[in-house]
């Protein structure tokens, strides 16, 4: 299983030499790329060295145990350590999502259920904002359309690590956690507008895309159609007397992004381009993932974005994730941002599926 690790150890040593050369840092973009790869390999190399050392220590202990039975317990303990390191190394060798270090743009759309769905979209927004606050991420509402009762028909939020340029540690970006949130979220509760106390079911859709930098996506200006219009508020009333809202269409793919929250047309255009870049990057990645998934579909089912991924049942205070069979009765805490146990269940299931396929 670990034949390829020796090659990674050699690559790690080569990167260490390159990064020690001051001339390498004159090209900052290349230096960042080398540093990122070095950081990715460091835990693999460290664990592999511990694994090898434990194996050597175990052989030595076995030799001593032949003459001194007191060493038998040490052999047993070292054997246990080696098994643990073997499993840790297997996990480290699972192919990583290249976007795990990235920040994200999270979009919540009200779905079936009218006003109640829009109110639920607002609850989801608050949940994600609270979760980000707990972790120390930064959030920025890019664009939103409020409903008449105070919910959201549509809201887009940028979620960033503290530095605002993705994670400094490999695999610790916002995407690594929030990518499992994409899909249809269903709510079961008595709506505020329900006079007879009947439980209703409604839903809101969540779309999560890794935020793309300009270097990630090349966009030809000739492929864009830019439309301007007046901003609108709840109920569709105009809130601006100038055509400051912007809608950008990427003609080759039909991908559309719009923004109306900023005060000027230029600011709205910049935000719309930001959303468009992330959507185009996500579309390209999904196409690549689809091709890879077609080849392995018969072997493994991984956690992915699918319809009705989660149910929020208010009468029972229950949260259920249907993809991984997760169920807990702390819905009030989850909606207050205590999402880690739900997300970790998805992370663990995804890792297990990838390990089984490796």
UniProtKB/Swiss-Prot annotation:
Cite the post-translational modification comment. Methylated by PrmC. Methylation increases the termination efficiency of RF1.
Family membership, please give it.
Belongs to the prokaryotic/mitochondrial release factor family.
N5-methylglutamine occurs at which residues?
237
Task: Give the matching PROSITE patterns.
Answer: RF_PROK_I (PS00745)
The UniProt keyword set, sorted, is: Cytoplasm, Methylation, Protein biosynthesis
NCBIfam families recorded: prfA, PRK00591.1
The protein here is known as Peptide chain release factor 1
Q: What is the lineage of its organism?
A: Bacteria, Bacillati, Actinomycetota, Actinomycetes, Kitasatosporales
Major localization listed first in the record, in broad terms: cytoplasm
Where, subcellularly, is it found?
Cytoplasm
Q: Return the PANTHER family for the record.
A: LD18447P
What role does this protein play? Peptide chain release factor 1 directs the termination of translation in response to the peptide chain termination codons UAG and UAA.
| One MF annotation (Gene Ontology) recorded for this entry | translation release factor activity, codon specific
